[in-house]
């Protein structure tokens, strides 16, 4: 029988892993779950560590391709340009994230109504873009030019508002800028590696006094749950969106956001 703290860790880990790489906002789901189930403080402390499980999941799934691209970069201009494109897309998040971190954590993360509203609005945008995005010009993530990558990087910064979704912002940005559905998702995966690793390191430093060594068991449960769930999602997502697009996730966001908003307005 799991005790309540271990169950919280398991729930948070599964939520993080299942929602991090699909465009529904893992942070929004975690914060709303924390609010309604009464473990906001636990959610904040565990989230710092379980992010690492999701980071390692995408690194595991893409390890072979990542190593191949890095090895090819010194003599393959296409591979080199792709690595530069990922780093260029990462830079806006570094600058804006460091400058706005305090405000984001202190204000935006404490506003459940904002989170629910952003889930709904993001779902509407995702449904629109899934139908109305221009004809793709880039069917492979490695073909995205640097100026497109930089624009995606700035669009990613919108996801600092909880409920927007990092993967959602980058995928929508990619689709609107000419990436195919699979290419947009794959570039989002690669961009997540430095972005999430950087966010994890920065949050770990900022919350170093919050983490409790006596809770290593619960932390391990959340970490493993996030890792396993994220591996399964990453392996499934590319094939799914290639065949069906992103409408499912738009409706998911609208449904979750609407239920959460109704509950919040009712006083829960």
From Swiss-Prot:
Q: How does it sit in the membrane?
A: Multi-pass membrane protein
* Hydrolase is among the record's keywords: yes
- Cellular component GO terms, alphabetically? plasma membrane
Q: What EC number(s) does the entry state? A: 3.6.1.27
Q: Just give the chief location class.
A: membrane
Keywords of this protein's UniProt record, alphabetized?
Antibiotic resistance, Cell inner membrane, Cell membrane, Cell shape, Cell wall biogenesis/degradation, Hydrolase, Membrane, Peptidoglycan synthesis, Transmembrane, Transmembrane helix
Q: Which Pfam families match?
A: BacA
A GO BP term, please?
A: regulation of cell shape
Q: Does the keyword Plastid apply?
A: no
User: Which reaction is this enzyme known to catalyze?
Assistant: di-trans,octa-cis-undecaprenyl diphosphate + H2O = di-trans,octa-cis-undecaprenyl phosphate + phosphate + H(+)
Superkingdom, according to UniProt? Bacteria
Q: Which GO terms describe its molecular function?
A: undecaprenyl-diphosphatase activity
Places the protein is found: Cell inner membrane
Q: Which residue pairs form cystines in this protein?
A: none
* Transmembrane parts of this sequence: 4-24, 50-70, 84-104, 109-129, 144-164, 185-205, 214-234, 247-267
Question: So what family is this one in?
Answer: Belongs to the UppP family.
Q: What else is known?
A: Bacitracin is thought to be involved in the inhibition of peptidoglycan synthesis by sequestering undecaprenyl diphosphate, thereby reducing the pool of lipid carrier available.
Q: What does this protein do?
A: Catalyzes the dephosphorylation of undecaprenyl diphosphate (UPP). Confers resistance to bacitracin.
| PANTHER family tied to this protein | UNDECAPRENYL-DIPHOSPHATASE
Name under which the protein is recorded: Undecaprenyl-diphosphatase
């Amino acid at each position: 029988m799991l005790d309540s703290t271990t169950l919280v860790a398991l729930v948070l880990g599964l939520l993080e892993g299942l929602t991090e790489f699909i465009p529904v906002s893992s942070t929004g789901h975690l914060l709303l779950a924390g609010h309604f189930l009464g473990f906001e403080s636990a959610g904040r402390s565990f989230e710092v560590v379980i992010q690492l499980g999701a980071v390692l999941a995408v690194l595991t799934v893409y390890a072979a391709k990542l190593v191949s691209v890095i090895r090819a970069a010194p003599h393959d201009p296409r591979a080199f340009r792709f690595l530069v494109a990922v780093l260029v897309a990462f830079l806006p998040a570094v600058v804006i994230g460091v400058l706005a971190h305090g405000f984001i954590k202190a204000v935006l993360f404490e506003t459940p109504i904002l989170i629910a509203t952003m889930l709904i609005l993001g779902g509407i945008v995702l449904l629109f873009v899934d139908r109305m995005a221009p004809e793709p010009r880039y069917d492979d993530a490695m073909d995205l030019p640097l100026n497109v990558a930089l624009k995606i990087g700035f669009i990613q910064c919108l996801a600092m508002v909880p409920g927007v979704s990092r993967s959602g912002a980058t995928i929508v940005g990619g689709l609107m800028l000419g990436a195919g559905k699979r290419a947009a998702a794959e570039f989002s995966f690669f961009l997540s590696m430095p972005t999430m690793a950087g966010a994890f390191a920065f949050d770990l430093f900022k919350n170093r006094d919050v983490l409790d060594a006596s809770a290593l068991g619960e932390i391990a449960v959340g970490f493993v749950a996030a890792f396993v769930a994220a591996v399964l999602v990453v392996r499934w997502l590319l094939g799914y969106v290639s065949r069906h697009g992103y409408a499912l996730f738009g409706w998911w966001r609208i449904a979750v956001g609407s239920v959460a908003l109704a509950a919040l307005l009712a006083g829960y």
